[in-house]
Amino acid sequence: MIIGAITAFFAASVGLFQNDIKKVIAYSTMSQLGMMVIAVGLSQYNVALMHLVLHATYKAGLFLAAGSVLHAMGDQQDFRRYGGLVQILPLTYTVMLIASLSLAALPWLSGYYSKDLIIELAYGSYSFSSYLVYWLSVIAACFTMLYSVKLIYLTFLSYAQGPKGNYEKAHESPWVMTIPLIILALLSVYLGYITKDFFVGLGSQGLGNSIFIHPNHIILIDTEFGLPIFNKLLPLILSIIFAIFSLYLFEKNPFFFIFSSKISKNIYRFFNQRYWFELIYNKSIIKGVLYLGYITNTVLDRGILEFIGPRGAAQAVYKISIYFASFDSGSIARYGFVMYSGLLLILLLWLLIPNIDLF
């Protein structure tokens, strides 16, 4: 449960500061996987499976809509180079808007039925750790709304920021791409309402015969009827407030956060570079492993092992053969020297080893 909350918060905070359209959606996926882990940690496996199924629809719609935008804009992935595409890609805009609102758990869209329920279940466990998970999930939900607004605004609603040539060639995707977009948009709206009773309905067995939840962990009823209405509506209220605030700031200056102060630049860099985890990981672990590999390759593989292995043996045989080949020089004096040297060696062996039988 704690791991899921940290994952959801981490991925949402990192995704908020990304500028690549595919990275934003990818970190959003990571954040929603954290929400599923929260549900699993609460032993609400049916809710986790419900969120998995519903999340698949609107996230697939987001990825396909992003692909439609990339197809129109010449594979440009930085949405700071987009803007004004609502007039060129109205269908893609509609699908991405619906999928983003479902991702942000706007009421009565598919994401609302599972995502908000997971947050409510965290509070309904009534323990310190579950309260911590609840607040981390609420913050992650607010971040989700923020980067959804950022993605929609900078891609479709702001002024054109890209090269003129991209806009001249931009067009809506063909029907083989738009038909799946329409289907996923409809699922992002209706699938949650259709499947809610199957997954978490009080009067339906649903997955009761395939998923076992211990009676001590059944908190769905207490959460549904005993949770204060304020705690149920808090994620939605904060998300709407943050969405309005971000729209106002984006309308004034889309890049206000970067250029406001040096501190804000450092904060932006910190989250954009994923808490510097990759930098620390590369310098502390990867660099050491690569250096160890270099030493191993230089000293062992190309050093000791080569010296005593194939290269060393080949050189030894070659040098020995060259040495013995030097005796074949045609010189009678050298032949005599070799012959008498061999005779002396035999005599020494006979004298030093009395029991040896040489003759």
Enumerate the language-model features and the residues they cover.
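Alpha-helical transmembrane segments and their helix-start/interface "positive-inside/aromatic belt" motifs
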Residues: 87-96, 171-186, 334-339
